[in-house]
Design a protein with these regions (language model features):
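Catalytic PLP-binding core of fold-type I/II PLP enzymes
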Residues: 1-19
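Conserved active-site segment immediately N-terminal to the catalytic lysine
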Residues: 4, 18-29, 38
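Solvent-exposed alpha-helices and their adjacent loops that cap or buttress functional pockets
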Residues: 15-19, 30-34, 125-126, 160-161
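Active-site C-terminal subdomain of aminotransferase-like
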Residues: 28-110, 124, 193-195
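Short beta-strand-to-loop capping motifs
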Residues: 42, 135-139, 171-173
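A short linear hydrophobic-aromatic micro-motif
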Residues: 118-122, 154-160
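Conserved PLP-binding catalytic core of the aspartate aminotransferase-like
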Residues: 119-150
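PLP-dependent enzyme catalytic core of the Aspartate aminotransferase-like
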Residues: 152, 165-195
């Protein structure tokens, strides 16, 4: 069996054992760099010419491997920014430090959601993400009011995914703990005003 993972949302948020995967891919735009750059980590035994007919050249990893990842013009600026982020994370203490920071941020938000009488998290505890925290009020009109009022106080892009609705706090590596605390304080105020 081969495990393939899309780690676009959580790559570099905590240490991972890459040996447990056949292939990891991640758009870097959430935790590493600008949109348009992708990281692929693939197990060597999966780098072969044996691909399905019609597979686009960009997905034929043997071509990339044989050309030292330079088969086409690389996104130089994106790679440059990613390199800066890698150095920054290393300087901070690496992924163990990021994991602790991200767990601390997520705990603040999940603890509030677990105690709130208005807001409810939508993911069971054992499956909760450190990066994306979806929640609802249970009332679409109230969700819309929350989103509108949040925008007025500088909380942007809190609307949930279009297929799920509600709200979603994306607390990626770059989000400081102060940002999460600010969100929770706003949520408490909103809850008090909308009992």
């Amino acid at each position: 069996k081969i495990l393939v993972a899309d780690m676009s949302s959580d790559i570099l948020s905590q240490p991972i054992d890459v040996t447990q995967y056949g292939l990891i891919f991640a758009g870097v735009q959430k935790n590493i760099g600008p949109a348009g750059t992708v990281i692929v980590i693939i197990r060597e035994d999966l780098i072969t010419d044996d691909v399905l007919n019609g597979t686009p050249t960009m997905l034929k990893y043997k071509i990339h491997s044989d050309n030292n990842s330079l088969y086409n013009t690389p996104p130089a600026y994106g790679i440059y920014i990613c390199g800066k982020v890698f150095k920054y994370l290393k300087k901070l203490g690496g992924l163990e430090v990021m994991k602790v920071r991200n767990e601390e941020k997520a705990k603040i938000l999940y603890d509030y959601l677990d105690s709130s009488k208005l807001f409810n998290g939508t993911v069971v505890k054992e499956d909760r993400s450190l990066m994306n925290v979806p929640f609802i009020t249970g009332n679409k009109e109230l969700d819309d009011k929350f989103i509108k009022e949040a925008k007025k106080v500088g909380i942007e892009n809190i609307r949930g995914h279009r297929t799920v609705g509600g709200m979603r706090a994306s607390i990626y590596n770059a989000m400081p703990i102060e940002g999460v605390k600010y969100l929770v304080e706003f949520m408490k105020k909103f809850e008090e005003e909308n009992k």
